[in-house]
């Protein structure tokens, strides 16, 4: 029996080694991946079984299971080293600190799970793409540059800038057209489409593992009661990923998130830290079928190989711009949209913005029965919102509007007051 077991063990190992050599397999986070056309892709039980069936058509279930276990053990890796190389269809791009771009051949030694659906061609251009951007952003060069930076951030295998993107515009403002183009650019297999409020559900975040992008062209109006996971994903913090019928694991998401919308989502229940993690891109143009330049085939025109290569060149330009500027451009349109978003989501800001006379902040005490906090609390109650506590109320007004606090005597009593810096 021992001889037979040893013999079978050798067969299992031989089969496992053949699989490993033929497919360059790795086993990470309870998942197998095989190297194909320059990138590691999921390699499941069905593919192992198909291989065994071809070479051992009469193999029993135990044989298949043992080979699978041998493969997992031999292919196991603990983690993947971060690389700054960008995986595209015709090689691996390296963007140097001085802005030079080099194209290296693909290699199974560079473990990469995502490949952009574009060939690098530094001379590639696409007039249809140029015109579409010009139309969508009303010819604003800074808005187009911000779009390029967002594309450049997609190329980065990290989340150091800690930003998520809201694409805001009325219906028929090309948000879906651009979303379709960006999905194709990233590669459909590298994109998820999980709604904001679904991310926090038990298995919701499992769908973003190894994705370049999570994009939803038009999110439903939703209220988020907890934003901790959202902030962790955007900020590159480790999150616990639960998978159905598999072991949970800690994961750092290096992909990016884009959400298209007509109306802002409601973060008011947990708004702390949201504003600094957002970049808002405003889509200006509303398209009508009667417009002289209306193009019903725009999605196809923006999905050609030329369009993808031209978009890659824009992304490379945006990549360099991000590094040079040490962050994203703050355009005038983005600032306006951010102010509207904050006003909708921060009850303290909304209350201050609603005041007919902002000077009242310096004339009235913060606390007390007729104080500013009481007026704010009353407004929240009438709107059916939960008021922030007085400490947070005071801190927000101080940091956002440039006030300090000091105690003053009013009618014989000491009260805290806001004073200008």
Language model region names:
Residues 305-347:
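Phosphate-handling catalytic cores of nucleic-acid transaction enzymes
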Residues 210-213, 253-257:
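Loop/turn-to-beta-strand initiation segments
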Residues 204-246:
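Conserved nucleotide-sensing/catalytic segment adjacent to the nucleotide-binding pocket
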Residues 51, 181, 211, 225-233, ...:
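Alpha-helical scaffold elements adjacent to nucleotide-binding pockets in ATP/GTP-utilizing enzyme cores
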Residues 29, 61, 65, 72, ...:
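Positively charged interface segments
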Residues 1-12:
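Single conserved hydrophobic/aromatic residue that forms the stacking wall/gate
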Residues 21-46, 92-210, 279-281, 312-315, ...:
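P-loop NTPase catalytic core of nucleic-acid-dependent motor ATPases
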Residues 35, 42-100:
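Long, basic/Gly/Ser/Thr-rich N-terminal segments
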């Amino acid at each position: 029996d021992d001889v037979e077991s040893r013999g079978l063990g050798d067969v299992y190992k031989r089969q496992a080694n053949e699989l490993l050599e033929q497919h360059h397999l790795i086993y990470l986070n309870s998942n197998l991946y095989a190297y194909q056309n320059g990138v590691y892709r999921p390699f499941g039980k069905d593919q192992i079984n198909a291989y065994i069936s071809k070479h051992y058509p009469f193999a029993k279930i135990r044989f298949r299971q043992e080979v699978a276990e041998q493969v997992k053990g031999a292919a196991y890796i603990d983690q993947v080293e971060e690389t700054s190389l960008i995986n595209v269809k015709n090689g691996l791009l390296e963007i140097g600190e001085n802005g030079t771009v080099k194209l290296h051949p693909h290699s199974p030694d560079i473990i990469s799970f995502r490949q952009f659906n574009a060939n690098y061609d530094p001379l590639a251009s696409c007039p249809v793409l140029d015109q579409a951007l010009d139309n969508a952003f009303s010819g604003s060069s800074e808005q187009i540059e911000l779009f390029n930076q967002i594309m450049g951030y997609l190329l980065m295998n990290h989340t150091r800038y800690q930003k998520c993107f809201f694409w805001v515009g009325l219906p028929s403002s090309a948000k879906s057209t651009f979303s379709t183009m960006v999905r194709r650019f990233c590669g459909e297999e590298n994109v998820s489409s999980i709604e904001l409020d679904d991310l926090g559900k038990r298995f919701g975040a499992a769908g973003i593992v190894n994705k370049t992008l999570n994009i939803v062209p038009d999110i439903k109006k939703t209220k988020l009661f907890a934003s901790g996971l959202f902030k962790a994903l955007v900020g590159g913090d480790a999150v616990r990923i639960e998978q159905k019928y598999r072991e949970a694991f800690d994961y750092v998401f290096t992909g990016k998130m884009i959400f298209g919308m007509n109306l802002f989502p409601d973060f008011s229940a947990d708004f702390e830290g949201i504003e600094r993690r957002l970049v808002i891109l405003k889509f200006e143009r509303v398209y009508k079928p009667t417009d002289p330049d209306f193009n019903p085939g725009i999605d196809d025109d923006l999905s050609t190989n030329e369009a993808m290569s031209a978009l890659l060149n824009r992304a490379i330009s945006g990549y360099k711009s991000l590094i040079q500027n040490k962050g994203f451009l703050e355009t005038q349109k983005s600032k306006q949209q951010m102010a509207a978003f904050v006003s909708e989501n921060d009850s303290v800001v909304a209350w201050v913005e609603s005041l007919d006379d902002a000077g009242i902040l310096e004339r009235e005490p913060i606390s007390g029965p007729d104080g500013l906090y009481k007026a704010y609390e009353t407004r929240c109650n009438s709107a059916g919102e939960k008021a922030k506590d007085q400490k947070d109320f005071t801190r927000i007004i101080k940091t956002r509007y440039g006030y300090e606090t000091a105690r003053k005597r009013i009618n014989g009593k000491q009260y805290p007051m806001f004073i200008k810096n």
